[in-house]
């Protein structure tokens, strides 16, 4: 029996690693391995039912709460008008989150089944493979003349978010090997990754990737060799100089132009539309503190714009999709309960990562939080699956003792 339990856990890890590797090269297969891993985890938990405990705290809890929130909101506000619409973003996200919480709980609770040093090697292999495949795919797309690299995800922004976190996961796995040559490879990985992110044309990732790479490095090592740091910064500066005119400067000029247009009352730009959506979202939340349906949000927004706020009209273009801010999106549809649970999700996950000295989880959560200020990641199927798999695989790195 013990051998069966061990094999089930190992199979769950194996399937999770494959899903992680395929995140940016085959979204369909990524999703399939994600679900198969969960089904094996459920079977594993059935065998382990006598050992299941709720203490110590598991990051599966905040994930479960977000999933339950989405499902309850859907049943209260959307079910009456459309029934069980399997194509609903919120219903789909709730299903993935609820199932992912099982996977995270299983991998976290029974991580004693795998040797920590062996797990480091497997994680290195998985992230290295995933990073190499994604980078090669992205560079190939760029060589074919694609304006914004998007890899296997048909949205360049989401690809940039996932790629940046995958890259830092690989860098973290290199740090764990405690080898000087691999530290050099980690530096090279960061440089290559930054260049690929520039090719996606995603401003948030371009601005945050290097910053979070530095934060993760400082948090992991607690001290940095000055000479190595200076060499690395010089190389980064060189990449910035070479890439400035073709890749960076156009984005800076675009940002300046969009800000100027918004100040003149024109919100028909990327940033301008976001400002309008955020304003509309906050007003929706204030008017509906306990939540509302997507249809009700659209109807209320139309009336609000007609009644003295025509400068926010571009928000109507995106109101049926999302409002490009994780917190405002939650507040506008799920009211104060949705906002409170989302805050708990981020605070508890980041707090857990800090308490348990888990640099990987902390970095991933910080990027998810910061990216969520200008986009909605937890509704994207590919990104959601990637982050849930990474959260599950990050738990063996936590310095906790099982009871």
Label for each model-derived stretch:
Residues 168, 364-373, 377-403:
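Transmembrane alpha-helices of multi-pass inner-membrane enzymes
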Residues 102-105, 115-146, 154-221, 243:
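Alpha-helical transmembrane segments of multi-pass inner-membrane proteins
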Residues 268-272, 276-279, 286-334:
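Long extracytoplasmic/lumenal interhelical loops at the membrane interface
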Residues 36-38, 59-73, 83-109, 122, ...:
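Aromatic-anchored transmembrane helix interface
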Residues 227-228, 332-366:
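Hydrophobic transmembrane alpha-helices and their immediate junctions
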Residues 12-18, 321, 325, 351-374:
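Loop-to-helix entry and N-terminal half of a specific, functionally important transmembrane alpha helix
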Residues 1-11, 176-184, 355-358, 376, ...:
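A juxtamembrane structural motif centered on a specific transmembrane helix
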Residues 220-264, 279-286:
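A membrane-periplasm/extracellular boundary helix in multi-pass inner-membrane enzymes
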């Amino acid at each position: 029996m013990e051998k069966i339990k061990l094999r089930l856990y190992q199979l769950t890890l194996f399937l999770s690693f494959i899903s992680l590797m395929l995140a940016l090269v085959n979204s369909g297969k990524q999703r399939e391995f994600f679900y198969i891993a969960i089904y094996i985890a459920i079977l594993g938990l059935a065998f382990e039912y006598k050992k299941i405990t709720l203490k110590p705290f598991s990051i599966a809890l905040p994930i479960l709460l977000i999933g339950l929130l989405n499902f309850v909101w859907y049943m209260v506000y959307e079910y009456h008008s459309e029934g069980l619409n399997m194509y609903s973003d919120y219903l789909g996200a709730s299903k993935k989150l609820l199932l992912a919480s099982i996977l995270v709980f299983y991998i976290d609770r029974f991580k004693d089944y795998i040797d920590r040093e062996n797990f480091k090697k497997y994680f290195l292999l998985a992230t290295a493979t995933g990073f190499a495949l994604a980078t090669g795919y992205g560079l190939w797309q760029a060589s074919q003349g694609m304006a914004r690299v998007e890899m296997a995800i048909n949205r360049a922004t989401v690809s940039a978010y996932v790629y940046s976190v995958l890259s830092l996961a690989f860098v973290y796995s290199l740090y764990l090997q405690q080898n000087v040559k691999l530290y050099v490879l980690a530096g090279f990985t960061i440089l290559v990754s930054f260049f690929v992110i520039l090719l996606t044309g995603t401003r948030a990732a371009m601005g945050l990737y290097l910053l979070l790479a530095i934060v993760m490095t400082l948090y992991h090592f607690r001290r940095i060799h000055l000479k190595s740091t200076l060499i690395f910064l010089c190389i980064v500066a060189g990449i910035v100089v070479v890439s400035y005119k073709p890749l960076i400067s156009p984005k800076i000029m675009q940002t300046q132009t969009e800000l100027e247009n918004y100040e003149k009352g024109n919100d028909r730009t990327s940033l301008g539309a976001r400002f309008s959506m955020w304003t509309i979202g906050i007003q929706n939340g204030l008017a509906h503190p306990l939540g509302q349906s997507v249809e009700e949000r659209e109807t209320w927004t139309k009336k609000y714009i007609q009644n003295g706020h025509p400068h926010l009209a571009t928000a109507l273009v995106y109101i049926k999709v999302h409002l490009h801010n994780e917190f405002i999106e939650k507040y506008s549809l799920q009211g104060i309960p949705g906002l409170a649970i989302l805050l708990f999700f981020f605070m508890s996950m980041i707090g857990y990562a800090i308490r348990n000295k888990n640099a990987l989880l902390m970095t991933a959560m910080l990027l998810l939080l910061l990216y969520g200020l200008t986009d909605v990641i937890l509704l994207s199927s590919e990104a959601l699956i990637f982050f849930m798999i990474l959260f599950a695989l990050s738990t063996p790195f936590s310095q906790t003792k099982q009871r």
